[in-house]
Amino acid sequence: MTRLLACAVFAAFQLCAHAQAPARIVVPLTPGGSPDTLARVLAQGLQAASGQPVVVENRPGGNQNIGSELVAKSAPDGRTWLLAPDNVFAVNPHLGKAAFDPLADLAPVTLVARIEFVLVVPQSLSVRSAGELVALAKSKPGELNYGSSGIGSPQHLGALLLERIGGVKLNHIPYKGAAPAVADLLGGRIQVWVGAANSLLPHIRDGKLRALATTAGKRSGALPEVPTAAEAGLRGYELDPWLGLFAPAGVAAETINRMGADAARILNAPQAKARLAAQGIDVQTSTPQEFARFVRDDNARWGEIIRSAGIKAE
């Protein structure tokens, strides 16, 4: 691709006007998870097509607020983007006052993926189905530990749904991230985890973890043999976390539209989409307008659940 053509196709990233400064995709989480994986696929696609550097910058902390605020307060010049999970927009605003307003200070670009979550237990726990787990939890109220990567995290909300629908009481142990929690899960120090399939697949396949149910409305392409929560007897249980691409508020609509189209083209390429699906990442894209409506609706839905459950910030 010639430089002129690359500039025309990837004008959204403004790679040509500022070739000396790499564009960046900020991920408000540590490397290795689904958001980081998607950001790197996107960055590689943009860089390969344009010939200009695109870097992924991991800025974890503050329940994903630190990296998200960084982007919210960046110049609206089309050089800085945020690839973030749903809780930044749907959950965090209901848990306390942040130094920025994600719904006002960040502009939706496109939905990028749904992340397949799975309910797992360590192989040392003598349950082989969601029904058996519920029965065990009922016989030992408050004795089974579940982990999460923090108050209001998808893992926390997933376990709360399990408690409410299963009619059980579990003991919550929040961690600073998923990695230390999964390490304790493998060691049997916590007994229940509802988390992203891609980070759990190796442990499920080598028999260290047992998958009891997936949390979306349909079975996982990566774990087709595992029933959905509804199929496993947890009727009404559905947790379908998403990831999206955002820009600082004030970025030109034309730039946002072009970036959304570029991201959709890269992530929906058959090879990339299949590789991500094998990791439990279901690529889904949208227009900026569709995504903006979706974000507002999801914020309202989780706000009701959080208020009803009485969840408070740490």
Q: Which sequence ranges carry the predicted segments?
A:
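Cleavable N-terminal signal peptides
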Residues: A6-C7, A17
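N-terminal (or domain-start) structured segment
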Residues: H18-D105, E143, G167-V194, H203, ...
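C-terminal lobe and pocket-closing loops
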Residues: R114, L200-N268, D297-A300
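A ligand-binding cleft/hinge motif common to bilobed small-molecule-binding domains
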Residues: N87-K97, L161-I165, V192-V226
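N-terminal signal peptide c-region/cleavage motif recognized by signal peptidases
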Residues: A12-H18
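An extracytoplasmic/periplasmic, membrane-proximal ligand-sensing/linker region
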Residues: R164-I165, R205, E231, A253-E314
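Hinge/capping helix and adjacent helix->loop/strand transition within the periplasmic-binding protein
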Residues: K73-R79, P93-P180, A229, W242-R275
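Beta->alpha turn/N-cap motifs
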Residues: L83-V88, S148, A178, G195-L200, ...
